[in-house]
Amino acid sequence: MNSSRAVSLSTDDVAGTAKVSARGVIDWFAPVVPDSRVAIFRTICYLFVILDMHLIVRDPISLSRHPELYRPLMLERLFQLPPPSLPLTMALYVILLFGCLVAAANRCPKTAGYLVAASFTWWTAIGISYGKVDHDHLALIVALWVLPTVGSIPGRWDSRVRSAQAGWALKCVQIAVVSTYFLSAVTKIRSGGWSLTSWPESSILMWAVVRRPNGLGQFLMPYPELLHLMQWFAFTAELCSLVVLWLRGRALLLAALFWLSFHVFTVAVLYIHFAPTLICWLAFAPLERFRPWLNGVIADWRQRTGRRAARQTVPIFRDQAVDGSG
């Protein structure tokens, strides 16, 4: 009797522990966050895509004039996408431009969102099918695919609703942001014959500085030991980047500032930016606080402007000026 009761209690404990563990995993992958955070993040992402297609991946239209240089990526081969042509790239450009404007206003979030996601994925694939394959767009493309899953948000920026659906979408973007760094480290290990020391012990940074003698980099060329140390630092930071996914509060803020500084430094040394990834770091931020802060700034400005206008002197014909405040 006692033995069967003990077995029953043990089974209940195991089931309870499993349920708690499953709930913890679900809460981590799909935390309940304000929907307004997604609404604001959507606006930022879609407006950035317009900038991206004009300033970063801006050459698919011109590249489509040279079909002999086209080397399709695995994605394009897998879906048997047609080779780029001038009409095709122009159509993608128009679809992206109007689709982003609609989606940035949080209108037709699923229709416009998926249309932009598919078009920009194809646009970016075309842009990197003629040369070097960059990895700075990973998080942005993931964001474009998961943001439409949240659907319509009543009140948009001013929404007071909280949902796990919004949390899941943002968590996917966060994982993609961190994966950009971690997978970069894995690629370095793989390219070095699966050796942890091959890439950081190489002279790749010196080669990059010699190849791009710009900005701060040209002043670092006489110091190969420092460049060598910087390689180890960057490689170690990329390997440890997964920790960011479990940080909260001030620790998360410090991590975000660290990676922001990291990218500022790469711009200063090599003129290489990671703007699409940096935009997606906003998936970690409490963006729902932006609207109240903006409303407060506008209210303060209006109040100060109103006081100034009230204190201005008002000239009266054939009389001395009087104070408009009373």
Q: Could you say what each language-model-derived stretch is?
A:
Residues 2-326:
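Alpha-helical membrane-anchoring segments
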